[in-house]
C-alpha cells in the first residue's frame, strides 16, 4: 500500500503540566484545534514534540492519546529517531504501530555517522 501524505502537516508540541507530567487535557485540546483548523495530517513526536526529553512510555502514551482523539480523521505521522540505533530498535519493537500512517525518522545527528552508517541505521 502506498500512502500519499501531502498538504499541511503540523509537528505537534507536547504540553506539560506544572509538575512535568504530560498535560493530556491540553493535548486533547491541541489535537482537536489542529484538526478543526483544517490541517491535512498530524506529526506526533516530531521536531517540537519534546521526544528527546521523554521516556518510551511517555512517547507511547502521547501517541495513543492522539490516536484516540484523532480517531482516524487525519493521517498520523510519528517521529522516531535518535542517535542510539540499537536502543531505538529495541525500544520500539513492541510499540503499537496500529494507526500510525508514516514515520518521520531523523538521521543520527550527534555522532555524525558516515553514509554507510546512516544506511545501516535505517536498515536496522
Where are these regions (language model features)?
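Active-site beta->alpha loop and helix N-cap motifs at the rims of alpha/beta catalytic domains
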Residues: 2-124
